[in-house]
A protein has these predicted regions:
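Alpha/beta enzyme core
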Residues: 3-12, 24-49, 58-71, 82-150, ...
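Terminal accessory/targeting
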Residues: 8, 13-18, 324, 328
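Histidine-centered catalytic micro-motifs
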Residues: 17-21, 77-82, 246-255
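Cofactor-binding active-site loop characterized by glycine-rich and histidine/acidic residues
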Residues: 54
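Electropositive, surface-exposed helix/loop patches at the edges of structured domains
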Residues: 77-87, 132-146, 211-213, 292, ...
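Long, intrinsically disordered low-complexity tandem-repeat segments
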Residues: 144-187
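Active-site proximal loops enriched in glycine and acidic residues that flank catalytic Cys/His/Asp
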Residues: 218, 251-253, 275
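C-terminal alpha-helical cap/extension of soluble enzyme domains
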Residues: 256-333
Length: 333
């Protein structure tokens, strides 16, 4: 089936699952999971994925698109966490229908200016654009839109003058940062109420930038490996009432099923998931290699890993599709 515009897949009361892919096996697993669930899905290629592939967007985009087009599922192709305009400007020609431009590490006024310019370019080239406001935290790979000397720490930057460390460094002159949304001496981390998206500011941001969707900070964090995050459901309700575009939840791997379903019921339209799939994938690889340490053919461990990821995708899509259903005690557990 041809790629589908992401906007046509968003429906009130159902969370649209958006899954990050790193390899061909990831893309195959996500699409297989969507087919099994009978639900639409988003294949997401992040800026970090592009870095992993040597900075070359087109090969991984073409591979993901080919997998989607060979499927019976409705699939959108989305470029996630774009941190510079040069990569954004490759998106339309590479087959993407949408992108997420991430200038959230900049001070508010600069975030607005950079995002407004990105949205103008995207709309002129037929792209749907998502942006972020607030501190979700946990992103690896650097700060948004070259924020050296700004307020957010990079994953590989030097700590000169920085007040808060990241996983591998902080921003020169920066006051907050880190792959874990660290708080040492700086800005509160992603789980702190002070880091969350303000509804009034969110409305101003959307109005000023013209974006098509907004990723909001409501208590989740990227790269969590335990499902212990507690979302600010009241804030989601207020954001949904204030903002006229779909809301997006990033860092959803650490959010329990019941919390995800509540979030969808309260107004989250798109749910980004990556780490949970990597846990399923690498767990299956470890299990296969532990059972047969002498195996040398990568297909012997990649096939079960792909199957495990597909099962995780199908399950999570089912969770998100039930966002408008009355919750039970089982869901809340």
């Amino acid at each position: 089936m041809p790629l589908v515009p992401i906007g046509t897949l968003i429906r009130p009361g159902r969370g649209l699952g958006a899954f990050n892919v790193v390899s061909l096996e990831h893309a195959e697993a996500v699409v297989a999971g969507a087919e099994a669930a009978g639900l639409p899905v988003v294949l997401q290629i992040s800026h970090n994925c592009v870095r992993f592939h040597g900075g070359r967007l087109r090969p991984v985009a073409r591979a993901a698109a080919a997998v989607a087009e060979g499927s019976t599922a409705r699939v959108a192709l989305h470029l996630d966490h774009v941190e510079d305009e040069a990569l954004l400007h490759q998106a339309a020609d590479a087959g993407f229908g949408s992108a997420m431009f991430d200038a959230s590490g900049l001070p508010y006024a600069r975030n607005v200016a950079a995002t407004r310019a990105a949205a103008g370019w995207a709309h002129a080239h037929g792209l749907w654009l998502e942006a972020e406001l607030g501190e979700v935290g946990g992103k690896a790979g650097g700060t948004a839109v070259g924020a050296a000397g700004g307020t957010a720490g990079g994953a590989a930057g030097g700590a000169a003058g920085g007040a808060a460390g990241g996983a591998a460094g902080g921003a020169a002159g920066g006051t907050a940062g880190g792959v874990a949304g660290g708080t040492a001496g700086g800005t509160p981390g992603a789980h702190s109420p002070q880091a969350r998206t303000d509804p009034a500011q969110a409305l101003d941001f959307v109005t000023a930038t013209g974006v098509d969707a907004l990723a909001v900070a409501v208590g989740s964090t990227h790269a969590m490996t335990t499902r212990t995050a507690e979302l600010d459901q009241d804030l989601i309700v207020r954001l949904h009432a204030a903002v006229p575009v779909p809301l997006v939840l990033h860092g959803s791997s650490g959010v329990p099923d019941g919390e995800l379903r509540r979030a969808v019921r309260h107004g989250i339209a798109k749910v980004n998931i990556g780490t949970a799939l990597n846990l399923a994938f690498t767990g299956a690889v470890r299990q296969r290699l532990a059972a047969d340490p002498a195996v040398t053919d990568p297909r012997r461990y990649l096939a079960p890993a792909r199957d495990a990821m597909a099962a995780a995708v199908a399950r999570l899509l089912g969770v998100l599709a039930l966002g408008d259903r009355d919750l039970t005690e089982h869901d809340i557990a």
